[in-house]
């Protein structure tokens, strides 16, 4: 049995609904922290986050490390960015800066929930192997070793509240 919400919701990089989406700083910070926990360079993760936000927003303005329609249209097999939330994590593969190696590294940790809400991780269902997700929700303030230790030290009955968990 696996908690289906033990993942980073790629759509939490943005806020809003439909085609009215803007960057969600908390989601961007969590995405960068997840990548760092996986050993990926922060600068690269920041650029991919910017490009993914540009992929989903409809404003046509290029973020610092992002890419809008002109970048994609100029490719050998031109296409346009979506301008809406991602329906499948595999859409990330079309985003500027995401090659097959990066996608393969990130894919096990990602999901595309039909909402822009941040992933509601349940610390009582996380396994030690899922510690990078805990690093992400802490914005990197909790290191990978510390996240693993906290999960390994979970009380037999779990934590009664999120406050009790974060008090660790």
Give the location of each predicted region:
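Compositionally biased linear targeting/interaction segments
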Residues: 1-168
């Amino acid at each position: 049995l696996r908690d289906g919400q033990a993942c980073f919701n790629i759509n939490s990089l943005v806020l809003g609904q439909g085609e009215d989406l803007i960057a969600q700083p908390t989601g961007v910070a969590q995405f960068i922290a997840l990548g760092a926990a996986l050993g990926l360079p922060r600068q690269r993760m920041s650029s991919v986050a910017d490009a993914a936000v540009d992929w989903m927003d409809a404003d046509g303005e290029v973020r610092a490390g992002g890419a809008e329609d002109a970048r994609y249209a100029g490719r050998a097999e031109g296409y346009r960015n979506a301008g809406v939330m991602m329906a499948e994590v595999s859409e990330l593969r079309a985003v500027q800066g995401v090659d097959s190696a990066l996608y393969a590294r990130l894919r096990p940790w990602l999901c595309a929930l039909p909402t822009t809400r941040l992933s509601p991780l349940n610390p009582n269902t996380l396994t030690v192997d899922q510690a990078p997700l805990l690093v992400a929700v802490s914005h990197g303030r909790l290191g990978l070793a510390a996240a693993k230790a906290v999960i390994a030290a979970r009380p037999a009955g779990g934590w009664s509240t999120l406050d009790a968990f974060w008090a660790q």
